[in-house]
Each structure stands twice: as C-alpha cells, then as structure tokens.
C-alpha cells in the first residue's frame, strides 16, 4: 500500500547532518520509504492514502541506543540519602546501590518486571522513540538474566517499538561470587552466554569495564566468548576512570563504547579506526553531578560518530525523556543541536548495527519518522520537557502511544 506524506519540511539526517528538504513529500510503500524529495517533484500515483502533515518538521524516529529499562524496585530513597550527605559507599555497604536492584529484580516475577518496564518504555515512546536498546544486568544469574531478556523480547512484541536486546551479565559482581570475579566471568562465558544465545534472547553483549566492576582482561574474555557465538559487543567504558576500555572495545570492533568521560585521545583514534560509536550519556553525568566531560574535541577531530542515549536506569539516570537528553548533551557537553539530533537518529542506529535500515529518511530504509509541530529542528534540543505536538509513524503506519 502506497501512502503520500506531504506539506512538511524534512530533516532526513542523511550522512549525520540535517540534510534539509523544504516543502517536502515522502512516499512510503508498506513499511519502507519509496521516494523522498521536494513536493513539486513527487511522483504521480494512485495513492491509497494522502496525509497532510500541516507544515510539520519531519525527522527520523528517535533511537534510544542505551537503556536499562527492565528492573525491579525503586531507588529514589537513595537519591534522598545522597542529598543528605550519605556517600555511595555507605549506601552500598548497607546493602543499597546496584545490589538492592539485583535483589528486587531477582524477587520480581516476569509479569511484574514487564508491567513496570512497560510504563517506563511508554514514556520514552511519547518522546518520539521508535527503536530502543534494552540491557539485562540486574539479574546476574542465569535464571534472572533469562527472565529480564524474556521481558525485553516481550516489550518489542507488544509495544510499537523496535527493541534490541543486550546481555549485560558482566555488569556487577553478584553476592554469591563475592571476591571471586574471575569465577563469575568464567560462568558468564561458559554457561550464561551460550544458553541465552541458544534461546535467541541476545542481540549483543555488553560489559562494564571499571575499577569497581571488571578489568579489561576480564572484559576481553567476555568479548571472546561473544564473538565465538557470533554476537557483536558493546562496552561501558571510561565513566569513572581511564582503563582504556574504549580502545579494547575498538580492538574487538565493538558497535559502541559508552559513557567515555575519562577516555583519551588515543582511545578516540582507536575508535575512529574501528568505526566504534561513542555513546554519550548526559543523564548519568548530570544525575551524578560529574565534572569530567567526554573529550568532545578529540572525538570530533578524529571523526568518531557520536550518539546520545538516556541510560534509563534506577541508580544513575532515571531518565524518562530522550528529548531532554538532547538538551543535556548540548548544555553539558557543548554538542550542537544538529550533532545531538544525529546522536539519537543515524549515529544511534549505527551504535546498534541498524544503520542500513534505520536512523535516516532515505529511499529503501524503514519508514519510522516523527512529524513535529516545531519552527525548526533545533527546537527539539531547545525545549526542556513538555510534550511537543507530534505525529509518530512506525513502519509506515501512524501509531498512538
């Protein structure tokens, strides 16, 4: 079924820049874009439907390429404690921090996890998100990681959003493996990843490379196991210290390395050579009141593609708005609105290995787009919060969230 969408301006984000088409039109056939260009040049045809977009600015559907949407419990109490002067170490010693989320997630049923994650994901969708990545990592044993990954798959089946599932079993050390991190890494590589991959629950594998998590040597073992299973890898790296995890990620041609506040220029050079995307997470930077910014000039200088994501998680970025992250990327990291928009479209698609089908409005790509009632594309990063008037189209069909 062919549909004509017209009376709009388009920021197609082809090549990662606005690539503006004024007074534009677009033809979709089924779930894909068949033609896009100036309205005066639109092909004549017997369209099943003609949609007037009322002068809207059309962008690709937003892609949130780094989230931890599925978890049990609530850590707003810790937020209060930290603001009253209790340190993160004291909270963790009392059983809080990530350990409390692991306990709550393990205790929750699959149905309970689905219900709470669905609400959070709907908030992202109301912001124009049409594709999302969701990580496991709050189970830290085979049964609980499987439970989370099954919920992630179900979210993609029941909501109007394309979902990529990432296994982050190497997120933290579970209590039953205290002081035995090498043994836990061996369990991930020999038992967890093969079983979960065999069940078709995993699209990519991630790990947390940090002094309070896992060493580069341990992460490399996870990467080798993932590659033996034919799975692409990603990495949380350089958030709190420099371990050159991003260079390790580049060596294994990772889809992305994420956070990166403490990365070096040498890391940026390695990522550029491997095509590894830098995923910046301004929500966590803001929420933790960090002061060390990612090396933006090094990333730009060496041509590293830069994505932006919500990092939605209960401990360090309880962010329910990807559009708010656009503003934070601009204000905290001095990105331009154009760079930030590329960060949640084409470069986010690249961070998920989806750039051939998603992330820009080009012939042959999937027809995921948002028609925004705004004056110019920069408005998407300019307005703080609120619900901008919009129409969301996924796979060529208008959806209501």
From Swiss-Prot:
Pathway: Amino-acid degradation; L-histidine degradation into L-glutamate; N-formimidoyl-L-glutamate from L-histidine: step 3/3. InterPro entries: Amidohydro-rel, HutI, Metal-dep_hydrolase_composite, Metal_Hydrolase. Gene3D superfamilies: Metal-dependent hydrolases (3.20.20.140), Urease, subunit C, domain 1 (2.30.40.10). Zn(2+) binds at residues 66, 68, 236, 311. Keywords: Cytoplasm, Histidine metabolism, Hydrolase, Iron, Metal-binding, Zinc. Belongs to the metallo-dependent hydrolases superfamily. HutI family. This is Imidazolonepropionase. The gene is hutI.
